[in-house]
Amino acid sequence: MFKKTKPRISILALTISCAIYSGAALAQDAANSNKFWWPEQLNLSPLRQHGVESNPMGSTFNYAQAFKKLDLNAVKADIKALMTQSQDWWPADYGHYGPFFIRMAWHSAGTYRIYDGRGGAGGGQQRFEPLNSWPDNVNLDRARRLLWPIKQKYGSSISWADLMVLTGNVALESMGFKTFGFAGGRQDDWEADTVYWGPEKKWLDDKRYSGDRTLEKPLAAVQMGLIYVNPEGPNGVPDPLLAAKDIRDTFGRMAMNDEETVALIAGGHTFGKAHGAHKPETCLGKEPAAAGIEEQGLGWTNKCGKGNAEDTITSGLEGAWSVNPIAWTTQYLDNLFAFEWVQVRSPAGAVQWIPKDGQAANLVPDAHDKTKRHAPIMFTTDLALKEDPEYRKISLRFKENPKEFELAFAKAWFKLTHRDMGPRVRYLGNEVPGEILLWQDPVPEVDHPLIDAADITKLKSSLLSSGLSSAELVRTAWAAAASFRGTDLRGGANGARIRLAPQNTWAVNNPRELNRALTRLEKVQGDFNKASTGGKKVSLADVIVLGGVAAVEQAAKKAGYAVEVPFIPGRTDASQAQTDVTSFAVLEPTADGFRNYYAKDNTLPPTDMLVERANLLTLTVPEMTVLVGGLRVLGANSDAAKNGIFTDKPGTLSNDFFINLLDMSTQWRKSAKTGGLYEGLDRKTGKLKWTATPVDLIFGSHSELRAVAEVYAANDGQEKFVNDFVKAWHKVMMLDRFDW
């Protein structure tokens, strides 16, 4: 029996081998996507990512509760011990993994960008393609493998996303630096995020620039596969002043000002070294995503020398900045200004800089051989801190005031690693700093009794008799809540920032109407608070949302349905002093298909921008569909235009939008008068019935959206439409309620 089994195993192995290596077999199995055949077709896949189906923890797992039970001190002790437990398969530089883990944490968080809130440490996306295989992330696969025993030990109690950031903090602390704090609460993703990283088809290309080196929005890196800038200079041109421009642009797009930028670069380059022992094109294998299955998720296998230690290849630059690369010092800044720097090339051929005339040739110890010493190095981007006038002022101030430098780096590091976490209420753990920072978009805590059911009923009545139409109430509530971004958890109705700069001047919010509406809503709030007893109050933020609730309930009643739209009080009102105008400016929607708004300077079509807005609001395809249909009949267009209002009874929560959109008695054509608009004509008489935008018509044109629209247009679809709209409306109103 044993002899009979053996050849069968061999045959099975041969079969598997053929399946793996036969390109023809794979080609036969792989079907071309619809996008291949129809590249202009609207892509709805962003609205289907990160579903519960891909999450092995299931929908009932509560990460926050699991993290709260974690002994964070024990985790940190294990991480600290790991720092000096050098492994033969990946020896630690200078006997300490600290600098390696700082780079891992930095590159995990450093993908964040302000224009769409994508990137950042949340989700632990560094584990997935494309980030796990970016040229700028060479060898960080090893950093995560070094951490695996700790992740394995604590399991689901700490996410990869939190662990990578925490490890960066412990790395700093283990080398003598006092961090500003740490907050947990980052849940892991289980699949690669759908993110536009740039138009390039090759690594390190830079087709993202136009004109006089204008970087395409929302991108925040100079080349495909880099976190920020090219350390050798723009496109490898070793010009520190040109590099300074790239640094200021990219770090600014990551929400960092000049002082924070200098602190991060100078602080980060205090530690560790760059690796360029050999030419990567000669020595390195394929990146993790392209490596063989036997590599088990690792990549960049180095066939030169030992393949690690003194033969390590990462960026291609080679050397350390300071004399003691595993301790917090001011040596980076001291060296930067102490020497005149000249160009040389690393063993890998990369341009870098060393002190002129052989100065300090033996200043820096070797990372692995105690008998060797080297000159300190600088990147072109390091010299930018010396050559750029503003960066130079800050760098010299930090050099002369070490304590100020230390605090600046601590705060900038905390901001770097926590920028995408949203408000402080999401922060978990006993190391959350007590200081409230402006970039956290703070809102006051509730310091008064909240309104109850009787109060809510009374306020609804006051709102409906305030002189505002139901459409105005809906528009104001939507404008407040729909500023939310699920990417970095900013925006939303809480704080009532819609009454503050810059939101009160956004074109999409129709400032003149908004001012009128807010005046009426503030009167309702003021009258209630003046008449209330026992210290009970209602915030303007709650009044704004409640106005939308009252209007939706009234509209449903007109349609014949008595529904109660959920409402949970507890929002508070932020002040202008708590609102960074520049920081909030990037949240301004240049398109909002739910309000049929589309600014002329957009580069993407209105339908793509609708999907983008729905994605930022964390909506599904059905939720997007029902909200558009409902908001149209409620008259929620930003400028009160009639486009897409396919009903003869506006203000009634009917399914008329879908019924009339799918009505074959209407023939659609492009408007000859107004670009971007369509006219719906009676097929028999040619009489104009409706006008529409592409966002309206896509629900009848796109096969998947039409399938959903048909559900709501059916004879039995009205009640489902009302219930689904109410549920989706409530979801949007609550997106920023992390306190609930």
Swiss-Prot record:
Cofactor, free-text remark: Binds 1 heme b (iron(II)-protoporphyrin IX) group per dimer.
Tryptophyl-tyrosyl-methioninium (Tyr-Met) (with W-106) crosslink location in chain: 228-254
A Gene Ontology BP annotation from the UniProt entry: cellular response to hydrogen peroxide
Subunit comment: Homodimer or homotetramer.
EC number of the protein: 1.11.1.21
Post-translational changes noted in the entry: Formation of the three residue Trp-Tyr-Met cross-link is important for the catalase, but not the peroxidase activity of the enzyme.
Name the UniProt record assigns to this protein: Catalase-peroxidase 2
Residues given in the record as heme b binding sites: 269
PROSITE patterns, A to Z: PEROXIDASE_1, PEROXIDASE_2, PEROXIDASE_4
Family recorded in the similarity comment: Belongs to the peroxidase family. Peroxidase/catalase subfamily.
Residues of the signal peptide: 1-27
Molecular-function GO terms, alphabetical: catalase activity; heme binding; metal ion binding
Covalent cross-link site, Tryptophyl-tyrosyl-methioninium (Trp-Tyr) (with M-254): 106-228
Gene (UniProt): katG2
Known catalytic reactions: H2O2 + AH2 = A + 2 H2O; 2 H2O2 = O2 + 2 H2O
Site (Transition state stabilizer): 103
NCBIfam families: cat_per_HPI, PRK15061.1
Co-factor requirement: heme b
Assigned keywords, A-Z: Heme, Hydrogen peroxide, Iron, Metal-binding, Oxidoreductase, Peroxidase, Signal
Gene3D superfamilies: 1.10.520.10, Peroxidase, domain 2 (1.10.420.10)
